[in-house]
Curated annotation (Swiss-Prot):
ZnF C3H1-type: positions: 68-95
Transmembrane segments: none
One Pfam family linked to the record: Torus
Protein name: Pre-mRNA-splicing factor CWC2
InterPro entries xref list: Cwc2/Slt11, Nucleotide-bd_a/b_plait_sf, RBD_domain_sf, RRM_dom, Torus, Znf_CCCH, Znf_CCCH_sf
Main location: nucleus
Record text about domains: The C-terminal RRM domain and the zinc finger motif are necessary for RNA-binding.
Keyword Zinc-finger part of the UniProt annotation: yes
Gene Ontology CC annotation, any one: U2-type catalytic step 1 spliceosome
Region spans: Disordered: 1-23
Subcellular compartments: Nucleus
Keywords, in A-Z order: Cell cycle, Metal-binding, mRNA processing, mRNA splicing, Nucleus, RNA-binding, Spliceosome, Zinc, Zinc-finger
Amino acid sequence: MTGDWKNRPARVQLQESDLPSSVPPQTGLAFNVWYNKWSQGQSGSTRFVTPYSLDPENDSGITKGDKEGRIHFCLYFAKGMCCLGKNCRYLHHIPEPDDFARLALHSSALDCFGREKFADYRDDMGGVGSFKKPNRVLYVGGITGALNNKTLKPHQIENRVKYKFGKLGELDSVRYVESKNCAFVKFKLQCNSEFTKEAMGNQTLLIPTDKEWDLRKEGTGLLVKWANEDPNPAVRKRELEEQTQETLKAIKQLVASTEGTVNQKRKVEEINEVRDSQANSRERFSIRENAIIDKTILDKLKQRKVTITNTNVAANITVSKPSSVLPLVTQYSSDED
């Protein structure tokens, strides 16, 4: 994902009038407002292909969240259904290393969308995730339904998963397990795995060049969950070390870029000061150049003014006649006693 999104405002993905109802399709007799699901009906949830999807290249852009210094991403943007566009107060772009560093410095108890994590994973490995056990690996199931039963070779399926998921962040590895008909996708950064889990849920693996593309909504969509932790202690230790290194690397890059921005601002200010001083000196020089009276004539006039002033001062001085001298004290003699 390139940085072109920084030069344009985020676009509206969906008009507000076209937003779907928050109530899911009826599958039971009673609707539970607390869990947002139907009860007393069919067990299990019916999967489908969502009609909304994220187009990172065209949907990404600047929002109010960028201007306000927000660090969390828009959940509806990830699902391809944000109706606010540039007026959204959350971020509208694919998470980058600088975003990961800001999230890591802020809190590890919140995901990239600002939702609170839990101490443990859910039994079905869905949901927001755990703050005790960071996870960069996603389990991807429902591949057959996401392909509308299209027959592909194992390496073709793996490449298609890599193509679809690679748009949402830098991948560390992708492994397709043919016997289980599922895939495991590992990202470089955890924020990308959190973002992708929401963005790729109930999405299709078909591409526009497939002849089944027009019928993609008849499939069942992908099932994206958190992968279970590796039971090997050595692997868990290595994974923790890798995550720590990635976090430190991202924080160092963020600090370096911040310092570079500050230094660049200082250089710009210094250049502006030099330009202002040069402009002032040029202005003073132009005044001298374009003077009405020549400098030599001005000097002669100054000298003449000084001469005239001295003459006037001398003329104003008057000499008074000396007065008769009077004795200061009458002479005193002791003979008068």
